[in-house]
């Protein structure tokens, strides 16, 4: 689904320069035309926005860029298809979830998205085997604006920022309205430095319930 068909489109168009949005469209067209090994599939670039409409967004989980191996990236941060082994960061997310709330078998986090969890990467495309290769190319003004749009919306939300990169996006969030949860990244390099034991899932639900919003069924 193209960006223009999502519920986020009017707010994005109001916030960003039309010339920049044209450059985004051109980048997508040229990148996928020139290289067949770009992830996720072109139709899934904006999957997070498609599956989590702005009015239904309750939680935002920031990622950096898509998984760069074949068959992994879905357009949802940290998620992989059901039949794909969980990458190390996702293994640790599920480990913390099990300790915090309970065990979840599925590696596919689509059901989180459809409950109002925006699984947003800061960079929306990646070439095969080249992590962060598209960082700084085109995407950040758009994804930064999406964080701002979610923050400017009045409904109380939880923003989950794992690691220094995600935490650099804190500047776009109005903490008088929303809860920001920060910890180390779930990567094996840092998970034992504050990610494990941080209880983001139960803390998010506690906030949502306190604000009169439906909690997330993280085990679904």
Curated annotation (Swiss-Prot):
It is found in: Cytoplasm. InterPro entries: UDG_fam1 (IPR002043), Ura-DNA_Glyclase_AS (IPR018085), Uracil-DNA_glycosylase-like (IPR005122), Uracil-DNA_glycosylase-like_sf (IPR036895). The keyword Hydrolase applies. GO terms for cellular component: cytoplasm. Its EC number is 3.2.2.27. Pfam families: UDG. The active site is at residue 65. Gene3D superfamilies: Uracil-DNA glycosylase-like domain. One of its GO terms (molecular function) is uracil DNA N-glycosylase activity. CDD domains: UDG-F1-like. Keywords: Cytoplasm, DNA damage, DNA repair, Hydrolase. One of its GO terms (biological process) is base-excision repair, AP site formation via deaminated base removal. It catalyses: Hydrolyzes single-stranded DNA or mismatched double-stranded DNA and polynucleotides, releasing free uracil. Belongs to the uracil-DNA glycosylase (UDG) superfamily. UNG family. Excises uracil residues from the DNA which can arise as a result of misincorporation of dUMP residues by DNA polymerase or due to deamination of cytosine. This is Uracil-DNA glycosylase. The lineage of its organism: Bacteria, Bacillati, Bacillota, Bacilli, Lactobacillales.
